[in-house]
Amino acid sequence: MLKLIDITWLYHHLPMRFTLAVERGEQVAILGPSGAGKSTLLNLIAGFLAPASGTLLIAGEDHTLTPPSRRPVSMLFQENNLFSHLNVQQNIGLGLNPGLTLNASQREKRDAIARQMGIESLMTRLPGELSGGQRQRVALARCLVREQPVLLLDEPFSALDPALRQEMLTLVSDICRERQLTLLMVSHSVEDAARIAPRSIVVADGRIAWQGKTDELLSGQASASALLGIKSHIL
């Protein structure tokens, strides 16, 4: 589904280089120290950064130079980027038509995803009238209504309390399984990663330093566990 072949981005003339393959329907966590290049990796996949070299394939098609708006990718950030002057219904509708002129089929898609997110009763409210968790549900609905096969999450739930964060992670995981979406999620928490991502990638110094089973990282048995401050539990 998603393949990066020597995708390179120059940061102050220092190259960050990524080679990666992710299958359709996989849920993968991207972990690593601050400043390691995790968000850079997502931004390269989404098209917000242009690589200096390399190839990016999605579903077998070359999207290395495809503009972000035309890539089969949706991305959710920590800052939800909702438009404060538009209500929930309109913010979700932007995912279908920037001009907000929706046909009957598009309106049904908008309303269906709102029901799935549990926000159908909030459609006439403005973002400022919502809680943090509700705003992230709206932002997630706007991503999902686009029906793109790849979903990128850049720590969108890190500001939420632990119980709400787990609820949102479970919701995302369930939807990705239901729709067979390919998910890549940046997180600082290996515990969060373990909840939804069987496989993890550890980024360090602009490279993929390790990839494998998330449980191995969490147990401290992986070679990259130390990069995340995780010690082995075996005496």
From Swiss-Prot:
Its main location: membrane. Part of the ABC transporter complex ThiBPQ involved in thiamine import. Responsible for energy coupling to the transport system. ATP binds at residues 32-39. The gene is thiQ. PROSITE patterns: ABC_TRANSPORTER_1 (PS00211), ABC_TRANSPORTER_2 (PS50893), THIQ (PS51288). Keywords: ATP-binding, Cell inner membrane, Cell membrane, Membrane, Nucleotide-binding, Translocase, Transport. GO terms for molecular function: ABC-type thiamine transporter activity; ATP binding; ATP hydrolysis activity. It is an enzyme of class 7 (translocase). Belongs to the ABC transporter superfamily. Thiamine importer (TC 3.A.1.19.1) family. SMART domains: AAA (SM00382). The complex is composed of two ATP-binding proteins (ThiQ), two transmembrane proteins (ThiP) and a solute-binding protein (ThiB). This is Thiamine import ATP-binding protein ThiQ. The lineage of its organism: Bacteria, Pseudomonadati, Pseudomonadota, Gammaproteobacteria, Enterobacterales. The keyword Ribonucleoprotein does not apply. It is found in: Cell inner membrane. GO terms for cellular component: plasma membrane. Its EC number is 7.6.2.15. It catalyses: thiamine(out) + ATP + H2O = thiamine(in) + ADP + phosphate + H(+). It comes from Salmonella paratyphi A (strain ATCC 9150 / SARB42). It is a peripheral membrane protein. Residues 2-230 form the ABC transporter domain.
